[in-house]
From Swiss-Prot:
Chain intervals for the UniProt region annotation (Polybasic region): 101-112
Segments for region (C-helix region): 457-467
GO biological process, one term: calcium ion import
Matches recorded under PANTHER family: CALCIUM UPTAKE PROTEIN 1, MITOCHONDRIAL, EF HAND DOMAIN FAMILY A1,A2-RELATED
Function: Calcium sensor of the mitochondrial calcium uniporter (MCU) channel, which senses calcium level via its EF-hand domains. MICU1 and MICU2 (or MICU3) form a disulfide-linked heterodimer that stimulates and inhibits MCU activity, depending on the concentration of calcium. At low calcium levels, MICU1 occludes the pore of the MCU channel, preventing mitochondrial calcium uptake.
Residues binding Ca(2+) 2: D423, D425, N427, E429, E434
Residue span of region Disordered: 55-108
Protein localization: Mitochondrion intermembrane space; Mitochondrion inner membrane
Transit peptide, UniProt annotation: 1-33
PTM-bearing positions, type Asymmetric dimethylarginine: R457
Designated name of the protein: Calcium uptake protein 1, mitochondrial
UniProt subunit comment: Heterodimer; disulfide-linked; heterodimerizes with MICU2 or MICU3. Homodimer; disulfide-linked. Component of the uniplex complex, composed of MCU, EMRE/SMDT1, MICU1 and MICU2 (or MICU3) in a 4:4:1:1 stoichiometry. The composition of calcium sensors within the uniplex complex can differ depending on tissues: a MICU1 homodimer can be present instead of the MICU1-MICU2 heterodimer in skeletal-muscle and kidney. MICU1 is recruited to the uniplex complex by EMRE/SMDT1, and it associates with MCU at low calcium levels, occluding the pore of the MCU channel. Associates with the MICOS complex.
Keyword Mitochondrion: yes
Amino acid sequence: MFRLNALSALAELAVGSRWYHGTSQPTQTKRRLMLVAFLGASAVTASTGLLWKKAHAESPPSVNSKKTDAGDKGKSKDTREVSSHEGSAADTAAEPYPEEKKKKRSGFRDRKVMEYENRIRAYSTPDKIFRYFATLKVINEPGETEVFMTPQDFVRSITPNEKQPEHLGLDQYIIKRFDGKKIAQEREKFADEGSIFYTLGECGLISFSDYIFLTTVLSTPQRNFEIAFKMFDLNGDGEVDMEEFEQVQSIIRSQTSMGMRHRDRPTTGNTLKSGLCSALTTYFFGADLKGKLTIKNFLEFQRKLQHDVLKLEFERHDPVDGRISERQFGGMLLAYSGVQSKKLTAMQRQLKKHFKDGKGLTFQEVENFFTFLKNINDVDTALSFYHMAGASLDKVTMQQVARTVAKVELSDHVCDVVFALFDCDGNGELSNKEFVSIMKQRLMRGLEKPKDMGFTRLMQAMWKCAQETAWDFALPK
């Protein structure tokens, strides 16, 4: 309505203009008529704009705007609660944040946030990864503060597409104040007594030094540790003391992507302390720190750590009667695959189609398969022998390889799930190359990838090319 009034006013102005130019009235009269027409059109336009703004302002808000306002209010409130400012200490008996029992379907915003977090996992420094995914800041008795991860935070920091809880991000933490009497009571909230995380620091929490150490242990093959131990075992008794183990740890860490990217940052407090944390040194070398660590005991520690991380990963899927669905197991296998999203979706749909009413998988079945994956290099060799001999890589062959190489039994149901994922043409035979490459990435949990976007390597290649070209010009053949 308002727009029609404005258009009619402009039309009258145009008619007046044509009349002005088409008549022979005196010049003064024409000017007065033109001025009146212009002022009238301006007044109509201005009043129309004011009325339109008033009508729009008085209209009731939409449902979406209500939700947005409520979300903004909740966000500002929660942000104030979890702010990392030193003066806003929380209650001493505050509970750890509750995990969502059921995962809602990811919306556009959630997908973009998860893509951003995946880039942090892949390309950021260990300092930033730790500060982003850690959720607790602990204030001790002297008033000093230190940031910690829970075991769940640690698993989330190395698992793609696991979204950080709302209002907890970079330098945003739940603040807790501990005293000596509360430590024993709080410990079981973060780690079970039988878990390897229970031995870490206070209450089973993970400091920055622990985080670097654990990622190093997870991303290093067992064989590398065996060689490093033998290099520093000068007397050949298979044991190393604390100083020798620190050297082993330093060398191994320098070969990992986390170690290569780490730089001590005193401003954030994330620096690698000399030696391990006191709890781990006691665990490895005894209370007096004069004990010896054997390669057997350390590899047992590595095995327990892998078991506990896998257990936490299994429990994140909220098992029903101790079982997770076949699709959830497939998601665990493909979590670090790097497969394109379209192909990944197609593989998951294929899995859902095969197991609409599946019975699920127990933790023991999942653990047996991951024990099989620990020997993936030997598995690759064995499968290659079968392939060269002309034998088909069917389920019976996979079970035979598992018994021979890893000394574990793979259930028929686990093999059915694996073949549903990697049997591309549906002929009942495994796609060997794709299966082995994806399983190698799964075993390393993506920690073996270089933590850069290739720009540095590109510059180095260009510099090397320029040097060689300049040398060719200087010394022509």
